[in-house]
Regions:
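Positively charged n-region of N-terminal signal peptides that target proteins for export
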Residues: 1-4, 19
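Sec-dependent N-terminal signal peptides
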Residues: 4-13
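Short glycine/proline- and aromatic-enriched beta-strand/turn motifs that initiate or cap beta-hairpins
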Residues: 17-56, 217
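Outer-membrane beta-barrel channels and translocator barrels
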Residues: 19, 62, 122-126, 177-181
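Residues that define the transmembrane beta-barrel architecture of outer-membrane proteins
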Residues: 20, 47-51, 107-111, 127, ...
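Residues on the lipid-exposed face of transmembrane beta-strands in outer-membrane beta-barrel proteins
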Residues: 26-30, 51-59, 71-73, 113-119, ...
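Flexible, solvent-exposed loop segments that connect beta-strands
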Residues: 35-44, 77-109, 141-162, 198-203
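Predominantly the C-terminal beta-signal and adjacent terminal strand-loop region
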Residues: 76-82, 159, 165-218
Length: 218
């Protein structure tokens, strides 16, 4: 039964792709990310570079409008300055006390499955211009923390980070047709988080990031 369902899904994708209503692609996206505090117990202490990559799926219900989704694996994060002494869990029975005034750098790994709307122009020369907006649900699959001189050096801190994250995104860019249905893509996107990333109830922060999206659509 499972094999039959998979076969039917593949047939549906093939038919849709043959009708040019479905486009698939791959992307790799440099990221600049930061954690924005929502309490006065912590302060932002700088951004961190990151990277994301994966698959793009676009389904068009009109020549100029479509639904976009995909699957991405990426690393983002940010630096936080704690204004009071904080206990950071590094395992089942281990923890590190970080003193007030210390900065902690978080590197966070996520699986992202975005869903949004894409609006695009007709092709002008070889160029097509587009805008996108939507939501980006994320699942945390890894979290590390570093604080120089305070006992944290890329330690795993899964208990400090919430499993689920959510942001809305908007941005735009350009596609360059290199032949047939194949296009190079470049765009700039901003994600604004609205779910607390930190599991500690007294320290709240959301994840924001700026993305340079680079990809190929087929």
């Amino acid at each position: 039964m499972k094999k039959l369902i998979i076969l039917l899904l593949l047939i549906n994708i093939s038919v849709a792709y043959g009708q040019s209503s479905l486009r698939l692609g791959v992307n790799i996206d440099p990221i600049t990310s930061w954690l924005s505090p929502k309490t006065n117990r912590i302060d932002k202490d700088g951004a961190r570079p990151g990277i994301s990559g994966g698959l793009m799926v676009e389904y068009y219900f009109h020549e100029n409008y479509g639904i976009v989704t995909g699957f991405n694996l990426g690393v983002q994060g940010g630096n936080i300055l704690y204004n009071d002494t904080v206990k950071i869990s590094t395992g089942e029975n281990t923890s590190v006390w970080v003193p007030a005034g210390a900065s902690v750098a978080y590197n966070l790994s996520y699986v992202t499955i975005p869903i949004g709307l894409k609006l695009k122009t007709n092709e002008i020369g070889y160029f097509t211009y587009f805008a996108q907006l939507g939501f980006a649900p994320q699942i945390n699959i890894g979290s590390r923390a570093t604080s120089s001189g305070n006992g944290l050096n890329k330690d795993n801190v899964p208990k400090e980070i919430n499993l689920l994250n959510m942001s809305y995104f908007f941005g735009g860019g350009v596609e360059y047709n290199i032949g047939g249905q194949t296009s190079l893509l470049a765009g700039i996107f901003f994600n604004n988080g609205f779910v607390d990333v930190l599991s500690n109830n007294t320290h709240k922060a959301v994840q924001n990031f700026l993305t340079l999206k680079l990809g190929v659509l087929f």
